[in-house]
Amino acid sequence: MSDRKYFGTDGIRGKVGDSPITPDFVLKLGWAAGKVLARHGSRKIIIGKDTRISGYMLESALEAGLAAAGLSASFTGPMPTPAVAYLTRTFRAEAGIVISASHNPFYDNGIKFFSIDGTKLPDDVEEAIEAEMEKPLTCVESAELGKANRIVDAAGRYIEFCKGTFPSELSLNELKIVVDCANGATYHIAPSVLRELGATVITIGCEPDGMNINEKCGATDVRLLQERVLAEKADVGLAFDGDGDRLMMVDHLGNKVDGDQILYIIAREGLRQGQLKGGAVGTLMSNMGLQLALKELGIPFVRAKVGDRYVLEAMQEKGWRIGAENSGHVILLDKTTTGDGIVAGLQVLTAMVRNHMTLHDLCSGMKLLPQILVNVRFSGDHNPLKSENVEEVTRQVEKELGDRGRVLLRKSGTEPLIRVMVEGDDAESVIAEMANRIADAVKAAG
């Protein structure tokens, strides 16, 4: 990917009120995107958002920009990111736009685009939009201005789509499920999907107020879900992030089940059913335990760069159908075009029901190696990873680990953070000490 001025690995993101997440910038972005997308013929755009209070302001700005370029907008209201991808396909819209900062706090927001086929916008189109941003905004003739409307049945359409990914001969009648929607975009979707498939559902994180999205709940903080699963004696817990493209789970014993374990369960079930095509794609952050467990099953495994767009690229290159990040982005190309927390959760529930096994038992074939991740914030105007001291400390740790572990240092694609990951088969306290040693060097350099 070439250097961009605005687009990162997952669209454009930042703090609301600071450039680029300002009303004037987003209006110009809508206009620039409209000018580029209008070249392809269709003049219809789907716009969805999560539950952040700033979503109202930003969707109005986007719609004004699109209208000035002659494109019409169809609003879905609060809707998971994968739902917008699905609706973009079914409405044959030229593009889908999601207003969300995913797992970030409410004061952040972002804009990301989907193509007509429900996949992330290609690099060359994003670059064309950036080029258009440099031009002065002009308005089409009055008769050619875009219009706006609401898709009143958007939620119902997506609920039926999700249910269709669960086998019709099975039901969730025997399961008691706690679902945590992070006070985000799945709050009015996920509970309905699970209830309509027969489950007894207890909800948390389903009362968004515009400011409580991802706050001590959802896929990035499952402590509340763990407590509730144990208190309710539930069979399983599902946690989504603010825009519904990530999934974390909790077993009946209160143990967290991450994206690596979810990928393992889905891959193994695909193998059992004779439906697995090729292998599975993880990332540089995927636990070595996943790689070893898949190898034992004879399932090929490759690592992509971190970021769901890179997982998808690797899947497409290989012709494989399943991939995931340990953060909970799970992509199942036989069912969806992008990461979908609800659909991924339904595939794990399918394995539980079909095999009469608990989530804990389904995870038992994979042993997670201790993996410590430390996030170090830096000023953003230089790269601490180029520090000689950081390189020297990293070499020392790698020498201590030998072939029993690995070190990964990388810059976040969305925030001014250096992520320090150390993994190995030593005791967790030993691995943590190694990670903190490197993190201290990064802090000193930052």
Curated annotation (Swiss-Prot):
The gene name on file is glmM
Record bears the keyword Metal-binding = yes
NCBIfam families, per this entry? glmM, PRK10887.1
Q: Which residues bind Mg(2+)?
A: S102, D241, D243, D245
Belongs to which family? Answer: Belongs to the phosphohexose mutase family.
Could you tell me what the cofactor note in this record states?
Binds 1 Mg(2+) ion per subunit.
The answer to whether UniProt assigns keyword Cytoplasm to this entry is: no
Q: Which GO terms describe its molecular function?
A: magnesium ion binding; phosphoglucosamine mutase activity; phosphomannomutase activity
A Gene Ontology biological process noted in the UniProt record is: carbohydrate metabolic process
Q: Which GO terms describe its cellular component?
A: cytosol
Q: Which domain of life is it from?
A: Bacteria
Provide the record's note on post-translational modification. Activated by phosphorylation.
The family database entries (Gene3D superfamilies) matched by this protein are listed as: Alpha-D-Glucose-1,6-Bisphosphate, subunit A, domain 3, Alpha-D-phosphohexomutase, C-terminal domain
For this protein's source organism, the top of the classification is:
Bacteria, Pseudomonadati, Pseudomonadota, Gammaproteobacteria, Enterobacterales
Q: Which organism is it from?
A: Yersinia enterocolitica serotype O:8 / biotype 1B (strain NCTC 13174 / 8081)
Kindly list the cofactors needed: Mg(2+)
What reaction(s) does this enzyme catalyze?
alpha-D-glucosamine 1-phosphate = D-glucosamine 6-phosphate
Pfam families in the record, alphabetically? PGM_PMM_I, PGM_PMM_II, PGM_PMM_III, PGM_PMM_IV
- Return the protein name: Phosphoglucosamine mutase
Chain positions with Phosphoserine modification = S102
The record's section on PROSITE patterns has: PGM_PMM
Q: What is its EC number?
A: 5.4.2.10
Q: Where is the active site?
A: S102
